[in-house]
Amino acid sequence: MSLPDRSLENIAQAQLDAYNAQDLDAHCAHFADDVVVAGLNGDVARTGIEAYRASYEKVFADFPNNKAKLLNRIVVGANVIDHEHVDRGNGDAPFQVAAIYTFKGDKIARVDFAR
């Protein structure tokens, strides 16, 4: 059973809100146990929620003022594509990223990043 587009959009927003609040538990709750993270058309960077969690635990520790601002979002089928402006808050230049979230049910099963 697939969720309506609006529900996927709401889940994507909830994980982004948790990311910006640096609430690791709330952020990770939106991802599947076997989540895959990869560069767009590139190598898989990490697999599984424990690896995902460890990665973002480090990001939150290293960049306590990190924020991602949503510039645009589209929903296509079971995919939510976010265009974000990311500012690490550490004096480094902000950057833009496209995050492509692929859903299985109400969980994000895969994330592909284009940067």
Sequence positions of predicted segments:
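Generic alpha-helical structural signal
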Residues: E9, Q13, E50-R53, E57
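Short, low-complexity N-terminal intrinsically disordered segments enriched in polar/charged residues
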Residues: M1-H30
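A beta-strand edge to alpha-helix "cap/lid" segment located at domain peripheries
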Residues: S2-P4, N20, A38, D43-V44, ...
